[in-house]
A protein has these predicted regions:
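Major-groove DNA-recognition helix of helix-turn-helix-type DNA-binding domains
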Residues: 20-49, 56, 65
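A short, Lys/Arg-enriched interface patch at domain edges and termini
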Residues: 52-72
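Polyanion-binding surface elements
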Residues: 1-29, 61
Length: 72
């Protein structure tokens, strides 16, 4: 049986904000102030997304950095 290629999973701003437990307004500030945050891109006029995998990698890096800072 032939394996299917992996399909990208995308997230809109509202879903990202929900995952982080913040408002979309706060997410806008994160985008403005954190150059490491994945950038949204338009898939159609008016619909911007980021790749879920990029978001999850960013979140893992943030969690790791927080743990390292916590332990000095």
């Amino acid at each position: 049986m032939k394996a299917e290629p992996a399909r990208a999973s995308f997230m809109r701003r509202q879903a990202v904000a929900f995952e982080l437990g913040i408002t979309r307004h706060t997410l806008a500030r994160v985008l403005k102030n954190d150059p490491t945050f994945p950038r949204f891109f338009a898939i159609t006029p008016g619909i911007e997304v980021i790749e879920r995998l990029d978001f999850e990698r960013w979140l893992q890096r943030k969690r790791l950095a927080a743990r390292l800072n916590q332990h000095g």
